[in-house]
Swiss-Prot record:
InterPro entries (alphabetical): AH/BAR_dom_sf, F_BAR, FCH_dom, Rho_GTPase_activation_prot, RhoGAP_dom, SH3-like_dom_sf, SH3_domain, SLIT-ROBO_RhoGAP
SUPFAM superfamilies documented for this protein: BAR/IMD domain-like, GTPase activation domain, GAP, SH3-domain
MF GO annotations: GTPase activator activity; protein homodimerization activity; small GTPase binding
Domain F-BAR per the UniProt entry, residue ranges: 19-324
Species name: Danio rerio
GO terms classed as biological process: actin filament severing; dendritic spine development; filopodium assembly; negative regulation of cell migration; negative regulation of neuron migration; neuron projection morphogenesis; podocyte development; positive regulation of GTPase activity
Protein name: SLIT-ROBO Rho GTPase-activating protein 2
Site (Arginine finger): R528
Cellular component GO terms, alphabetical: cytoplasm; cytosol; dendritic spine head; lamellipodium; nucleus; phagocytic vesicle; plasma membrane; postsynaptic density
SMART domains: FCH, RhoGAP, SH3
Gene name tied to this protein: srgap2
Length: 1100
C-alpha cells in the first residue's frame, strides 16, 4: 500500500495549500479594485460628456445669434430698397430670388441651431447626469454582492483546509498501526523458527525422559506463543480501526476538494460575469438613447439645411437671362413697350399720304429701288459675316463663363496630414496666376465682342431703314411679288419655310440616296469604308446652306464620302430615327424566331410612330433593300448594312449592356431591311414619297426637292413661252442649269479679270444664267466665268426673246393663247421651252459621261384614247414629229426625249467641238433669273429668219433617218418610241454638233410645234429611282406662264433661288450708246464692270 504521497510531509502540503489560498485572496482584492476603477472612469466619462455638450450648446447658441444678426442686417437692407414693382412673387427676378432664398436659408439655420442648443441643455445633458447617478448606485450594490461571494469562497477554502488536516492525521495513525502490526508478525515468525531449531538439537535417550522434556518445552512454547498471538490480535484490531478512519478521512477530503474546485470555477466563470453585468445594468442602453437623441437632432438640422440648399440649387438652375428679360419688360411695360407709330402730318392742306409713282418720278423710283436692292444685297452679306464673327465670339465668352470649376470636393478629403489640404487649396481656382490670365483673356474677348455687336447693330439698323424704303417703293411700283433677301440674322423667307414644312424627306437624305442609286449600287464596301472627311464636311455645309451639291448627273464625288454624309445626317439627329420609347418593344420582337411573325410585330410597334418618321423609314429601308440586292458587287448584304446603320438609327438607352443590346439592334435592322415591304404601310395607307428601285424615266419621286414632269394642262401649239416687251423687262427668265443656252461671239474679247472669259469672234459659248443686265454666267473651252452681253448673240432664244420691244415679239406675244400653262421645270426654267434639239444635244453631253455598261431605255406612256384632239394610239415607226397626242384629262408624265432620242449620230452631226460644254452640276433648286435682255439687231434677226429653209431641210432629213433606222432595227420596241441611248453612244462619234446646226435644229423644232416637256434635272436621262406617290408634290414655283399681252409673270411661289441683282450707274443714253454697244456696229463696245460674286450661300 505504498504511495508517492507518503514521501511528502504534512508541512510541505499545508504550506503549498496556504500559498495557493493566499494568491486567491489577493486576486479577489484586485478584482474589487478593478471594478472600483471602472466605476470611476465611467463617472468621469459621463461628466466629460456633460461638459462637452454644455459647451457645444453655448457655441450653437452663439452661432444662432450671429446668423440671425447677419440675416436681419441684409433683410432690413432689402426691405428698405425693395422695388415696389417687384412686390409680387411672380415678378421677382431669378438672381433676386436666389438672394432671398439664401437669406431665408440663413434664418432657417439660425433657428435650427438655437433648437439644437436647447436640446443639448435640456435633453442630452440631463440624460448623461442620470446615467452617472444610476451607474454609481448600481456599482455599490454590485460591490456588496461581490464581497459576500468572496466571503463564501473563503469559507469553502477554510473547510477544505480542515478536512485536509484531518485526512493527514488519520492517515498517519493508519500508517503507524500498520507498522506495529508488521512488527508483531515478525516476532511471531521468529518464535516459531526458534522452537524448530531447539527440537532438532535435543535427541531423546529414553521414552520417559523424552516425555518429560516434551512436556516442559511444550509448556514454555505455549505461553510465549499465546503472548505473541494476543499482541498480534491487538495490533491487528488497532490497524483495522485506524485504516477505516483514514479511508473515511480521505473520502471527506476528496469530496471537499471537488466542492472547493467547483465553487472557485463558479465564482470566476459565472459570478464575476454576473457581478460585472450588475455594474453595467442599463448603462449602455441609457448611453445609446442619449447619443441617439444627439444624432436625431443633428440629422434633423442636416435635413433642414439640405432642404434649404436644394431650394437654392433649384433657384440657381433656374437662373435664365431670357425669362428675366421678359419678366423685366412685362413689369415695366410702360417703359419698354413700343411707342405709337409716326403718322403722316399733312402740311397746309396736302392730303396725299402715299408715294407718288407717276411718270415724271417713276423712273427715279425704279432707279432708286434698284440701288436700294443692290445696297441691301451687299449689306446683308457684310452683316452676315459680322454676325457669324459675333456669334463665334459670344460662344467663346459663354465657354469661358460656364466652365465647370465649382466642384471643391478635393478640398474636403480628410487626411491626418494638413499638407495635402493646404496644397489642394493653393492649387484651386483662386490661384492668382491662372485667375489673372483668365480674367485678362475674358476682358479682351468681351471687348472684341462688343465691337462686333456694335457693328452688327449699326448694320442691322441701316438694313432696316433701307429695307423699309425698298419695300415701300416696290409696293408703290405695283410689282406682283416682293423680292426676299437673306437677312444678316440668317432668317429664311416665308416661301422657303413653307417649302421646308412640306419636305417630308429631308433634302440631304433624298439627294444622297438618289446619287447612290444612280452611281453607287455596285460600289464595293459602301457605308463601310470611310470617305474623305474634308469632302464630307464640304457636302454637309452645302446642304446646310440650302444647296444640293449632288444635283444633276455629274459623278465627280467620292461615293464613300456621300455615304458618310447620309450616315452623318442620321447620326447627328438630336433624337434617333427609332425613338427610345419603342426600344424595349422592338427588342422583344427580336426574340421571335419566325421572321414573318417578327415582321408583323415590328410593324405593330412602328405604326405607333408619327407618320413623317414612318415615311422616312419606309424610304430609307426600301433603298437599303435595293442596295443589298447588289451584295455580290458591293459586298454589303442586309447584315452588313445593319451593322453600319444599327448604331446610327437606334441608340441603346443608358443602363443597358451596350454590347449585347447592339447585337439585337443589328438583327432588328437586318429584319426591317429584308421585310420592309411587309413592315411599312404602302402609299395608299401612308401618303408620302416612295422609293422605287428604277423604271421608266417618267417615274419619279414625289419629293419637294424635285418637280414631277407632269403636264398639268394642254400645252399650246408651241412650247416656247412668249412675253411681250413689257414682260421681258420685268419678268425673270430662268434657265435650267443642266440645259445651257448657246451663244455666238460678235467680237473678240479679252477678259480684264480672272472672272471674265476671253474669246474670239464667231466662237460658240454656253450661257448658264443672267448675272445682270450686262453680264452672263457661262462657259468657254472648259472655263467658267462672266460673258459680256454686248459681245454675243444668243442663238437659243425663242423669237419672243429676240429683243426687247421688237415688233416680232409683240406680234407673237399677242398671237399665242393666254389660257395654256406648262408645269414642268424645263418649260418654266429654260428659255427654249420644249425645243427638242436642245434637249437632245444637252443630253448627249450627259450620256457621254455615263459608264457604257449601263443599259438605259426610255419609254413614253400610251396616251389614253378618247381624248379630244388625240390620235387613237402612237405608232412606233412613222409618227410625224408634230403628231404627238396631248392628254389634257389624265395629266400623264411625258418623256421629253420620246421622239428625238431615236436620232443617231449621223455624219452630218459630227462636227468639231470647241471644248467640253457640260457645266459641273450645281445645286438643284437654284434656278437662274434672266431679265432686261438687250435688243438684237434687225440684221441678225433677218439672217436667222433667212436660214429657216435650211433648218426645215435638216430636220426632215434627221426624221427620215430616224424612221429608216427604226425599220432596220432588230430590237423589238415597246408600244411607245424607245431608244437605247447606250447603243447610240457605242456606235456614234464622240463630238457634239456645232452651233449652226444646233440653231437650225432648234428653229425646226419650233416649227414642228411639239408639246414636249423636259423632265426635272437629269431624271429623263436614266432610269429614275423614284415613283409617284399618292400625294401631290409641291408645284414648281415657275410652273405657269401666260402669254397674253400685258400679262405678268405669275408665280404661286418665288424661284427656289435667285441671284442677287447688281445695279450699275445708269448710262447717259437709253439707246445704242457706245458704252452699251450696238449689234450693228463693228466696233466692240466698252464692257461694263463685272458684277460682284453672287452669294450662293444664302437661299432666297
Amino acid at each position: 500500500m505504498t504511495s508517492p504521497a507518503k514521501f511528502r510531509k504534512d508541512k510541505e502540503i499545508i504550506a503549498e495549500y496556504e500559498t495557493q489560498v493566499k494568491e486567491i485572496r489577493a486576486q479577489l482584492v484586485e478584482q474589487l479594485k478593478c471594478l472600483d476603477q471602472q466605476c470611476e472612469l465611467r463617472v468621469q466619462l459621463l461628466q466629460d460628456l456633460q461638459d462637452f455638450f454644455r459647451k457645444k450648446a453655448e457655441i450653437e447658441m452663439d452661432y444662432s445669434r450671429n446668423l440671425e444678426k447677419l440675416a436681419e442686417r441684409f433683410l432690413a437692407k432689402t426691405r428698405y430698397t425693395k422695388d415696389p414693382q417687384f412686390k409680387k412673387e411672380q415678378n421677382i427676378l431669378s438672381p433676386v430670388n436666389c438672394w432671398n432664398l439664401l437669406l431665408a436659408q440663413v434664418k432657417r439655420e439660425s433657428r435650427d441651431h438655437a433648437t439644437l442648443s436647447d436640446l443639448y441643455l435640456n435633453n442630452i445633458i440631463p440624460r448623461f447626469a442620470q446615467i452617472s447617478e444610476d451607474s454609481g448606485r448600481l456599482f455599490k450594490k454590485s460591490k456588496e454582492v461581490g464581497l459576500q461571494l468572496q466571503e463564501d469562497l473563503m469559507k469553502v477554502l477554510n473547510e477544505l483546509y480542515t478536512v485536509m488536516k484531518t485526512y493527514h492525521m488519520y492517515n498517519m495513525d493508519s500508517i503507524n498501526a500498520e507498522s506495529k502490526l508488521k512488527e508483531a508478525e515478525k516476532q511471531e515468525e521468529k518464535q516459531m523458527s526458534r522452537s524448530v531449531r531447539h527440537e532438532e538439537k535435543q535427541t531423546p535417550r529414553s521414552p520417559d525422559s523424552l516425555t518429560n522434556i516434551k512436556i516442559e518445552d511444550k509448556h514454555v512454547r505455549r505461553s510465549s506463543v499465546k503472548k505473541i498471538e494476543k499482541m498480534k490480535e491487538k495490533r491487528q484490531a488497532k490497524y483495522t480501526e485506524n485504516k477505516l478512519k483514514a479511508i473515511k478521512a480521505r473520502n471527506e477530503y476528496l469530496l471537499a476538494l471537488e466542492a472547493t474546485n467547483s465553487c472557485v470555477f463558479k465564482y470566476y466563470i459565472h459570478d464575476l460575469s454576473d457581478l460585472i453585468d450588475c455594474c453595467d445594468l442599463g448603462y449602455h442602453a441609457s448611453l445609446n438613447r442619449a447619443l441617439r437623441t444627439y444624432l436625431s437632432a443633428e440629422f434633423n438640422v442636416e435635413t433642414s439645411k439640405h432642404g434649404g440648399l436644394e431650394t437654392i440649387e433649384n433657384a440657381a438652375e433656374n437662373l435664365e437671362a431670357n425669362s428675366d428679360k421678359q419678366r423685366l419688360m412685362e413689369t415695366y411695360n410702360n417703359v419698354f413697350c413700343p411707342p405709337m407709330r409716326f403718322d403722316f402730318q399733312s402740311h397746309m392742306g396736302d392730303m396725299v399720304g402715299h408715294l407718288c409713282a407717276q411718270q415724271p418720278v417713276q423712273g427715279e423710283l425704279i432707279q432708286r429701288c434698284q440701288q436700294l436692292q443692290s445696297r441691301l444685297s451687299t449689306l446683308n452679306i457684310e452683316n452676315e459675316e459680322v454676325k457669324k464673327t459675333m456669334e463665334a465670339t459670344l460662344q467663346t465668352i459663354q465657354d469661358m463663363v460656364t466652365i465647370e470649376d465649382f466642384d471643391v470636393t478635393d478640398c474636403f478629403h480628410h487626411s491626418n496630414s494638413m499638407e495635402s489640404v493646404k496644397s489642394t487649396v493653393s492649387e484651386s481656382f483662386m490661384s492668382k496666376p491662372s485667375l489673372a490670365k483668365r480674367r485678362a483673356n475674358q476682358q479682351e474677348t468681351e471687348q472684341f465682342y462688343f465691337t462686333k455687336l456694335k457693328e452688327f447693330l449699326e448694320g442691322r439698323n441701316l438694313i432696316t431703314k433701307l429695307q423699309a424704303k425698298h419695300d415701300l417703293i416696290q409696293k408703290t411700283l405695283g410689282e406682283s411679288q416682293k423680292t426676299d433677301y437673306c437677312l444678316a440674322s440668317g432668317r429664311r423667307d416665308s416661301t422657303v419655310r413653307k417649302q421646308e414644312a412640306i419636305q417630308i424627306i429631308p433634302l440631304m437624305v433624298e439627294s444622297c440616296i438618289r446619287f447612290i442609286s444612280r452611281h453607287g449600287l455596285h460600289h464595293e464596301g459602301i457605308f463601310r469604308v470611310s470617305g474623305s472627311q474634308v469632302e464630307v464636311n464640304d457636302i454637309k455645309n452645302a446642304f446646310e446652306r440650302g444647296e444640293d451639291p449632288l444635283a444633276g448627273d455629274q459623278n465627280d464625288h467620292d461615293m464613300d464620302s456621300i455615304a458618310g454624309v447620309l450616315k452623318l445626317y442620321f447620326r447627328g439627329l438630336e433624337n434617333a430615327l427609332f425613338p427610345k420609347e419603342v426600344f424595349h418593344d422592338l427588342m422583344s420582337c427580336v426574340s421571335i424566331e419566325s421572321l414573318q411573325e417578327r415582321a408583323v410585330h415590328i410593324r405593330k410597334v412602328l405604326l405607333s410612330l408619327p407618320s413623317n418618321i414612318l415615311v422616312i423609314m419606309r424610304y430609307l429601308f426600301a433603298f437599303l433593300n435595293h442596295l443589298s440586292q447588289y451584295s455580290d458587287d458591293n459586298m454589303m448584304d442586309p447584315y452588313n448594312l445593319a451593322i453600319c446603320f444599327g448604331p446610327t438609327l437606334m441608340s441603346v438607352p443608358e443602363g443597358h449592356d451596350q454590347v449585347s443590346c447592339q447585337a439585337h439592334v443589328n438583327e432588328l435592322i437586318k429584319t426591317i431591311i429584308i421585310h420592309h415591304e411587309s413592315i411599312f404601310p404602302g402609299p395608299r395607307e401612308l401618303e408620302g414619297p416612295v422609293y422605287d428601285r428604277g423604271g421608266a424615266p417618267e417615274e419619279y419621286c414625289d419629293s419637294p426637292h424635285i418637280e414631277p414632269p407632269l403636264v398639268d394642262e394642254p400645252a399650246p401649239d408651241t412650247v416656247s413661252v412668249i412675253h411681250n416687251s413689257d414682260d421681258v423687262k420685268s419678268g425673270p427668265l430662268t434657265v435650267s442649269e443642266s440645259d445651257p443656252i448657246e451663244a455666238i461671239a460678235r467680237f473678240d474679247y479679252s477678259g480684264r479679270t480672272n472672272r471674265e472669259l476671253s474669246f474670239k469672234k464667231g466662237a460658240s459659248l454656253l450661257l448658264y444664267s443672267r448675272a445682270s443686265d450686262d453680264w452672263w454666267e457661262g462657259r468657254h473651252n472648259g472655263t467658267e466665268g462672266l460673258v459680256p452681253h454686248q459681245y454675243i448673240v444668243v442663238q437659243d432664244m425663242p423669237d419672243g426673246y429676240a429683243g426687247r420691244g421688237s415688233p416680232k415679239a409683240d406680234l407673237e406675244g399677242s398671237h399665242d393663247s393666254v389660257e395654256e400653262k406648262v408645269s414642268t421645270r424645263a418649260s418654266a426654267s429654260s428659255p427654249t421651252g420644249g425645243h427638242v434639239a436642245d434637249i437632245y444635244l444637252a443630253n448627249l453631253n450627259k450620256l457621254r459621261k455615263r459608264p457604257e455598261a449601263t443599259s438605259i431605255r426610255r419609254t413614253i406612256r400610251p396616251v389614253e384614247e378618247g381624248s379630244s384632239g388625240a390620235a387613237g394610239g402612237l405608232k412606233t415607226s412613222s409618227m410625224p414629229a408634230g403628231g404627238l397626242a396631248k392628254d389634257s384629262s389624265d395629266k400623264r408624265p411625258v418623256s421629253a426625249h420620246s421622239v428625238l432620242n431615236s436620232i443617231t449620230r449621223h455624219s452630218s452631226l459630227k462636227t468639231k467641238v470647241e471644248g467640253p460644254q457640260v457645266r459641273k452640276s450645281t445645286p438643284t433648286g437654284r434656278s437662274k433669273s434672266f431679265s432686261n435682255h438687250r435688243p438684237l439687231d434687225p440684221e441678225v434677226i433677218a439672217q436667222v429668219e433667212h436660214s429657216s429653209q435650211d433648218i426645215e431641210a435638216t430636220m426632215n432629213t434627221a426624221l427620215s433617218e430616224l424612221r429608216e433606222l427604226e425599220r432596220q432595227s432588230n430590237v423589238k420596241h415597246a408600244p411607245d418610241v424607245v431608244l437605247d441611248t447606250l447603243e447610240q453612244l457605242k456606235s456614234g462619234g464622240t463630238s457634239e454638233p456645232s452651233s449652226p446646226l444646233h440653231s437650225r435644229l432648234l428653229r425646226e423644232a419650233e416649227s414642228s410645234q411639239h408639246p414636249l416637256q423636259r423632265s426635272a434635272s437629269s431624271a429623263s436621262d436614266m432610269p429614275s429611282t423614284f415613283r409617284p406617290s399618292k400625294t401631290t408634290g409641291p408645284k414648281s414655283p415657275l410652273s405657269s406662264m401666260t402669254t397674253a399681252s400685258g400679262s405678268t409673270f405669275r408665280d404661286n411661289k418665288p424661284p427656289a433661288t435667285r441671284p442677287k441683282p447688281v445695279v450699275f450707274p445708269k448710262s447717259s443714253s437709253a439707246g445704242g450708246s457706245p458704252a452699251m454697244g450696238s449689234p450693228t456696229t463693228t466696233i466692240p463696245p466698252t464692257p461694263p464692270p463685272p458684277p460682284p460674286p453672287t452669294d450662293k450661300s444664302c437661299p432666297v
